[in-house]
């Protein structure tokens, strides 16, 4: 990915981290994973070591090993590998950012520490500037996910400040349902990539001008979401709405079961056939073997697979 000129767009899969049965990282599964995304889901961009990848539950050493393997296996097959480098420790985030640059990542992204939060928008900007400075030649994206971080500053206000302070800043992974804030980001800051991160509202974000989207469901529903985006771009709103509603119905089915990230990882294993292993504690999947047929039946009924 060139530092200037090229824009991130389209679907970006937020990858799960493959693990062994005892929750050690499983680098050997990544080659098969990349091939599945490219060949079956038509995905050409990935966001690694983020929320879906359980990045905050991994050690710095594990995250470096994963970044290296994702970059290695994606080379020649994918367009862009974005490495999430956010940590509770600023020094660890800078270490991961510098490592991402050295191993050939195409861009980096970070959340802000959420245990001891920034006391102001200016403090957040200073933090982001420090992280970005560790990899000044890599495009840098802020990861906004207030539901998990509790950091609720308006992003269109943030963009005005980072524009003046962080030369490598290229955009935001916007994982929030506030479409007014998102719309202002798109309309007021056209030089930045605004990537939407709430999968079940993607069509709404496209209507407001989203450049692309980062999400976990694009791992196993990437082709179907790609069909929706294509229908939208062609002006076939009826088809786009139909697909979005089917995707939403599937997610409602999953949420009504009380399931979350650990179970989504199980669904990815089931749909793809890739042994991704369990999630790392404190995440724990409550999915039972007899749920598998229910999931497949639901996806077939909704024409998702």
Curated annotation (Swiss-Prot):
Biological processes, Gene Ontology terms: N-acetylneuraminate catabolic process
Gene Ontology cellular-component terms listed: cytoplasm
Pathway participation: Amino-sugar metabolism; N-acetylneuraminate degradation
Pfam families (alphabetical): DHDPS
Cystines in this chain: none
Enzyme kind, highest EC tier: lyase
GO molecular function term, any single one: N-acetylneuraminate lyase activity
Chain residues that bind aceneuramate: 51-52, 175, 197, 199-200, 216
Stored Gene3D superfamilies: Aldolase class I
Localization per Swiss-Prot or TrEMBL: Cytoplasm
EC number in record: 4.1.3.3
Active site per database record: 143, 173
Primary localisation category: cytoplasm
Catalytic reactions of this protein: aceneuramate = aldehydo-N-acetyl-D-mannosamine + pyruvate
UniProt keyword NADP present: no
SUPFAM superfamilies, A to Z: Aldolase
Family annotation (InterPro entries): Aldolase_TIM, DapA-like
Keywords associated with the record: Carbohydrate metabolism, Cytoplasm, Lyase, Schiff base
Summary of the function given for this chain in its UniProt record: Catalyzes the cleavage of N-acetylneuraminic acid (sialic acid) to form pyruvate and N-acetylmannosamine via a Schiff base intermediate. It prevents sialic acids from being recycled and returning to the cell surface. Involved in the N-glycolylneuraminic acid (Neu5Gc) degradation pathway.
Recorded family membership: Belongs to the DapA family. NanA subfamily.
Quaternary structure and partners: Homotetramer.
PANTHER family reported for this sequence: DIHYDRODIPICOLINATE SYNTHASE (PTHR12128), N-ACETYLNEURAMINATE LYASE (PTHR12128:SF21)
Record-given protein name: N-acetylneuraminate lyase A
Protein source organism: Xenopus laevis (African clawed frog)
């Amino acid at each position: 990915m060139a530092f200037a000129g090229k824009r991130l767009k389209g679907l970006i899969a937020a990858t799960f981290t493959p693990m062994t049965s005892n929750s050690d990282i499983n680098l050997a599964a990544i080659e098969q994973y990349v091939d599945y995304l490219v060949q079956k889901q038509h995905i050409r961009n990935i966001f690694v070591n983020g929320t879906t990848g359980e990045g905050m539950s991994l050690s710095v050493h594990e995250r470096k090993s994963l970044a290296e393997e994702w970059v290695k296996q994606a080379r020649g097959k994918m367009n862009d590998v974005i490495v999430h480098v956010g940590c509770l420790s600023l020094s660890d985030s800078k270490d991961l950012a510098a490592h991402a640059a050295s191993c050939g990542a195409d861009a980096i992204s970070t959340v802000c520490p959420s245990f001891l939060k920034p006391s102001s928008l200016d403090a957040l900007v200073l933090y982001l500037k420090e992280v970005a400075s560790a990899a000044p030649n890599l495009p840098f994206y802020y990861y906004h996910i207030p539901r998990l971080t509790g950091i609720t500053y308006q992003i269109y206000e943030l963009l005005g400040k980072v524009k003046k302070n962080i030369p490598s800043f290229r955009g935001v992974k916007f994982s929030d349902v506030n479409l007014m804030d998102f719309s202002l980001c798109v309309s007021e800051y056209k030089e930045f990539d605004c990537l939407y991160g709430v999968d079940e509202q993607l069509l709404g974000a496209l209507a407001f001008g989203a450049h692309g989207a980062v999400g976990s469901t694009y791992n196993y529903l990437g082709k179907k979401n790609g069909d929706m985006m294509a229908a939208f771009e062609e002006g076939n709103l009826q088809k786009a709405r139909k697909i979005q509603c089917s995707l939403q119905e599937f997610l409602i089915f999953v949420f009504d079961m009380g399931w979350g990230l650990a179970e989504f990882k199980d669904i990815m294993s089931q749909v793809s056939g890739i042994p991704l292993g369990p999630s790392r504690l404190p995440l724990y999947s409550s999915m039972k073997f007899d749920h598998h047929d229910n999931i497949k039946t639901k996806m077939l009924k909704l024409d998702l697979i």
